[in-house]
């Protein structure tokens, strides 16, 4: 994958565009970004940290979401399913930083 030339607003626009399709196909109830991109501190080698909430967690669906967004954004996407059992440190970061669409 190439350098990330997308900024926070670009990525949020892509997520908004994909939200209804992901909800219908994969049961996504919420999604957003966190990490350096959400904080406005992303560099050209930064990945996209994506948080999703789903009706029924499904690893197969998460892989599809990841691959579709990597193709569209042309950069690496790390995806986290947000749930009660999410690592406490990661959950706190997401709670503080996440920008949902």
Residue ranges and their predicted role:
Residues 49-52:
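Short beta-strand->loop micro-motif that forms the acidic, two-metal-ion catalytic signature
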Residues 1-30, 38-44, 54-101:
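Catalytic core of pol beta-like nucleotidyltransferases
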């Amino acid at each position: 994958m190439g350098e990330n030339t997308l900024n926070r607003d670009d990525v949020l626009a892509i997520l908004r565009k994909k939200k209804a399709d992901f909800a219908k196909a994969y049961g996504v109830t919420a999604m957003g970004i966190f990490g350096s991109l959400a904080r406005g501190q992303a560099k050209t080698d930064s990945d996209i940290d994506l948080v999703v909430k789903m009706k029924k967690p499904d690893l197969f669906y998460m892989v599809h979401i990841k691959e579709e967004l990597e193709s569209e954004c042309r950069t690496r996407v790390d995806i986290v399913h947000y749930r009660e059992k999410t690592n406490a440190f990661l959950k706190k970061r997401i709670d503080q930083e996440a920008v949902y669409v």
